[in-house]
Regions:
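Short, histidine-centered active-site or binding-site loop motifs used for metal coordination
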Residues: 13, 136-140, 193-196
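Predominantly flavin-linked oxidoreductase catalytic cores and closely associated redox partners
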Residues: 31-167, 175-185
Length: 203
């Protein structure tokens, strides 16, 4: 069930799934090890070519028939006036020490936080009666900083739930942009993920 501040709405038969990123990374590493896939952390400088792709990094050069590209978009290349903001978020995984919550209901948008010249809200994803992810999300040109989020989250949790313990933290940035993601890539260089415009419509 979803609650928009004070309005509750069931989402059955749809389910809300939460995937811990650490589990995803661990599974990916196991697959990479199984198939002898190497991981390199190098900045990509140039991708060029047609029949064979040449990928040049700051340290090396690689050749491949196909390249799959998930690098962040270069927003500086988009024209002025395009819809161009980011969804930045920061959250606490907390244990509530005073209040209990309904583990079957997640709170999707609570705007009872300062807006800071953007659009900001809290959402709460419960894990149990006394634990949840409490996250501050901002839509705007200026990215949410950890310090800003920590102050706002602490104020919010204390006001509505009382004392708490932080078990973990999470953060992220998702670009929200109306521009075409094609940035003159070679034919056999395939954009994937956010770069290909595949951010979920619900996001």
């Amino acid at each position: 069930m979803i609650i928009f501040y004070r309005f509750c709405s069931p989402i059955k038969p749809v389910k809300y799934y939460h995937l811990d990123s650490i589990n995803l990374y661990s599974w990916s590493r196991r697959i990479a090890e199984k198939y002898n896939i190497s991981q390199l952390r190098e900045k990509v400088m140039v991708i060029e070519g047609s029949h064979e792709i040449t990928l040049t990094t700051e340290k090396s050069q690689f050749f491949s028939e196909w390249v799959f590209d998930s690098r962040p978009l270069d927003f500086n290349r988009f024209k002025n006036g395009k819809f161009n903001i980011s969804q930045s978020f920061f959250g606490f995984k907390v244990k509530f020490l005073e209040k209990k919550i309904n583990p079957d209901v997640y709170q999707m948008m609570d705007f009872r936080v300062s807006q800071s010249n953007a659009t900001q809200f809290i959402y709460i994803l419960p894990y149990s009666e006394n634990s949840a992810l409490v996250e501050l999300t901002r839509f705007g040109r200026k990215l949410l900083t950890e310090k800003e989020a920590e102050i706002e989250l602490d104020k919010y949790i204390n006001e509505f739930f009382g004392s708490y313990e932080i078990m973990d933290r999470e953060k992220g940035i998702i670009p929200m942009n109306s521009s075409n993601s094609n940035q003159n890539s070679p034919n056999k260089c395939v954009s994937i993920g956010t770069r290909a415009g595949n951010v979920k419509p619900s996001t």
